[in-house]
């Protein structure tokens, strides 16, 4: 039986870090095709195409410099060509681009293709919240799983020990995806609550922006711990309101929940940029250009999408931390007033 073909849709720093793992495992395990395709948004780097650099030097010099990708990972600039014949699609692009990518892929996939989303964000549809895996699943007609956890891309690429969570309703598919992605230093737990796993990955970025504000304002560890805890409570409350399936508090104790929240509030890019925002007064857009090579920050966008949903449902008052992050980022509320917004939190009433 031929091995399952894998395509990685995306090649930013997280996409490239995952390509390193997937390429290595697919090259080693008989039940995967050793050739892994990776869709790369073509860019010009010093007069050379990024795909050409990746395919000759085996390194994504723009988004994951200093890390060699396995030679069996092949960069392809056309997403349809990259995905042709794939049995497993690994989605890892910024969430605002996923609609356009699905439109391009529609009608070009094999009958039994499955997908896994590593994308942290939510989509705000006409009827409220839509998870990214739902958007992909509906548009492409494929079953979707998710992978979320305390996984800062550079540390995963450096093969430092960490854990992650796969949310998958089908145990056999869950095992297949675990085989594809687990390594001695990238340990995976599979749970069936796909919605809860995914919502953790989206919402923690909002909390991390709040944690960054605390750092930028010089508020110290007690305040930051309170922000993280209140953020976790809002994450759980939001999940219970909006997830269609079961939401058990135990899932928040997996890597996708509290672990991802902690690492993002201490080390992630949302925190770093929010700290600079509080310190310098520069706009988020300006800081994205300066600090992230122009890559988009997920936290503020997710806060905006959530705010629109909460307004629609008349629930803004129940989520003061999420609301404060939105107001500071989009309505010009002074960042110095961030903590005041938390002093009458429903948790304290």
Swiss-Prot record:
Subcellular compartments: Cytoplasm
What name has this protein been given in UniProt?
Glycerol-3-phosphate dehydrogenase [NAD(+)], cytoplasmic
Q: What is its EC number?
A: 1.1.1.8
A Gene Ontology biological process noted in the UniProt record is: glycerol-3-phosphate shuttle
Q: How does it assemble?
A: Homodimer.
Residues modified as Phosphoserine are 154
What's its catalytic activity?
sn-glycerol 3-phosphate + NAD(+) = dihydroxyacetone phosphate + NADH + H(+)
Entry-linked Pfam families: NAD_Gly3P_dh_C (PF07479), NAD_Gly3P_dh_N (PF01210)
Q: Identify the residues that bind substrate.
A: 120, 269-270
Q: Which InterPro entries match?
A: 6-PGluconate_DH-like_C_sf, 6PGD_dom2, G3P_DH_NAD-dep, G3P_DH_NAD-dep_C, G3P_DH_NAD-dep_euk, G3P_DH_NAD-dep_N, NAD(P)-bd_dom_sf
Task: Output the PANTHER family linked to this UniProt entry.
Answer: GLYCEROL-3-PHOSPHATE DEHYDROGENASE (PTHR11728), GLYCEROL-3-PHOSPHATE DEHYDROGENASE [NAD(+)], CYTOPLASMIC (PTHR11728:SF32)
The species this protein belongs to is Mus musculus
EC top class named in words: oxidoreductase
